[in-house]
């Protein structure tokens, strides 16, 4: 185990990760974990649920610790047969060639991992995390206007609508000539290794939460994914991979981030929230929000105003519009 002293205050790190749409949760999470909708399936994460995932102490167990594994190649157990074993229960399990190649997926991941000096298990787990059952238009090869192009790692596949996500990702694939599975996986692996692993973001945790002050990119920037649960879910996939390959008894290096001013005990999963989340219309004064008649100065996150009230039973919130003399000339009410 390697101790990574970030030198960062924990609350400051959380506050920065709450901004700019950096941290999202899936729609299945409870409302107390959400602070407004980002896109059809994703919501801005609440402060408390973000703390749960950012607190390394919550992940120091077998099913989650692999988010701290250093992701470099190890020829002693990163074998093609081990990769094939991992892929057995995924959409990449076939002995048939991968799309528009003469190679199996297991050979592709193994060969690229050795070439890039990156764990092929990590590459396979990342694609599995991104693609699930393998039905995404990003890897179908037949999306209208982008026939014959593939983006297995979802590189640059972002946007506020599903169509934007798909077209942005496939534009990137087309611009980079990813016209077969090997080219797409090699290209994506290059992005991950050159832009992340070889630049100091060499764990799953650091690729989501860049809190490394020695990495090439400034802290809180250059983050691979928005899903705050991704490092934990990918870590479980990695653990299962090592287990299936009989590699759990191998030597691993885990790099654990350490923050300043951590809470005395691990941050728990929230079960409720007393936050009121509002989008204030243009022209209204958002500096003070009245909730049940009491004035609050809100926090600002992701173009929303967040007010923490004493309990979860708020009945109404009000903001005012003022003229040039400071006299109220209108109000907007939420109930």
Feature roles, as predicted:
Residues 303-307:
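Short strand-edge motifs at loop-to-beta-strand transitions and within beta-strands
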């Amino acid at each position: 185990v390697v101790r990574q002293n970030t030198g960062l205050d924990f609350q400051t790190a959380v506050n920065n990760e709450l901004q700019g749409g950096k941290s999202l949760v899936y729609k299945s999470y409870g409302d107390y974990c959400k602070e407004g909708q980002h896109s059809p399936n994703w919501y801005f994460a609440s402060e408390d649920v973000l703390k749960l995932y950012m607190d390394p102490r919550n992940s120091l167990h077998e099913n989650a610790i692999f988010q701290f594994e250093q992701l470099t190649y190890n020829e002693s157990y990163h074998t093609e047969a081990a990769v094939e074993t991992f892929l057995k229960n995924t959409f990449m399990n076939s002995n048939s060639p991968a799309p528009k190649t003469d190679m199996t997926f297991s050979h592709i991941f193994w060969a690229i991992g050795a070439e890039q000096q990156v764990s092929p298990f990590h590459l396979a787990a990342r694609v599995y995390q991104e693609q699930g059952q393998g039905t995404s238009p990003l890897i179908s090869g037949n999306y209208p206007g982008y026939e014959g192009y593939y983006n297995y790692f979802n590189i640059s596949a972002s946007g506020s609508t599903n169509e934007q996500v798909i077209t942005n990702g496939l534009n990137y694939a087309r611009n980079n000539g990813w016209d077969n599975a090997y080219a797409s996986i090699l290209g994506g692996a290059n992005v991950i290794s050159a832009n992340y692993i070889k630049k100091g973001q060499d764990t799953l945790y650091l690729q989501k939460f860049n809190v490394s002050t020695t990495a090439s990119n400034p802290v809180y920037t250059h983050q691979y994914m928005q899903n705050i649960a991704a490092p934990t879910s990918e870590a479980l996939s990695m653990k299962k991979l090592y287990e299936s390959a009989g590699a759990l008894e191998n030597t691993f290096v885990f790099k654990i981030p350490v923050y300043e001013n951590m809470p005395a005990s691990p941050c728990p999963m929230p079960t409720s929230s007393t936050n009121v989340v509002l989008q204030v219309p243009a022209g209204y004064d958002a500096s003070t929000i009245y909730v049940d008649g009491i004035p609050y100065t809100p926090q600002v996150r992701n173009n929303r105003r967040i007010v923490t009230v004493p309990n979860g039973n708020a009945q109404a919130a009000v903001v005012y519009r003022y003229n040039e003399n400071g006299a109220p000339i209108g109000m907007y009410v939420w109930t």
